[in-house]
Amino acid sequence: MDFAVPLLLDAGEHLLIDIFGNGERERAYDFLITAWSRGTGQYGYANHWVACIEEQIVGIISSWHDKLPGQFDRDTLTSITDFYGLDEAIDVVMRSQTYTIALNPPLVLELAIGHLAVAAGARRNGIATSLVRFKERMAREMGKLSVVLDVHTGNKRAIDFYQAIGFKPRQEIPPFMQMTKGVAPLG
């Protein structure tokens, strides 16, 4: 948790601080620690995969698809209401909705990836590429034909990275661009 949660926050710092911290980084970080520890829901450890070097977490990624169980959303909402209380949780959900309308859920034959981050000292070593390739294999095993992601349009470094590994822009709904990459089915 000492290394995973900071990476989770790094994966979407501006967005997560706005939604979960209402502009306060520490508040967002505290929520993510609590949500990660629960295990379940969108920010729980059970929905993330990590890359390690010598038992130290240096990378993180998450994924979701069109057939998530209803419990997934309930677990996410429970982690929010347990941390913030009901009144403040409503505000958190409302802030989240301002972003959610610009994000596209994956279609039936797509696997969406997100929360991708690599520790500063481990970058440019192929870790992010390896994490994405791992998810591409997972997509194939699930019978999906493409991997999709939403990236903030201001994150030029991430956009360049995704394009370098074969992702193409599909559509843009500010402040996000959805990118997609086809994956060959298992033969």
Name the predicted role of every residue range.
Residues 115, 124-138, 160-164:
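Conserved acetyl-CoA-binding loop-helix of GNAT-fold acetyltransferases
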Residues 1-6, 13-18, 66:
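A short beta-loop-alpha structural element at the N-terminal edge
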Residues 67-68, 150, 163, 168-180:
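Conserved catalytic-core motifs of GNAT/GCN5-like acyltransferases
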Residues 50, 56-65, 112, 117:
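Conserved beta-strand in the GNAT
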Residues 109-111, 139-152:
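Conserved GNAT acetyl-CoA-binding A-motif
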Residues 67-110:
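Conserved acyl-donor/pantetheine-binding loop and adjacent beta-alpha core of acyl/acetyltransferases
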Residues 25-48, 53-54, 101-102:
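Active-site rim helix/loop that mediates acceptor-substrate recognition in acyltransferases
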Residues 12-36, 81-86:
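Conserved GNAT-fold acetyl-CoA-binding loop/helix
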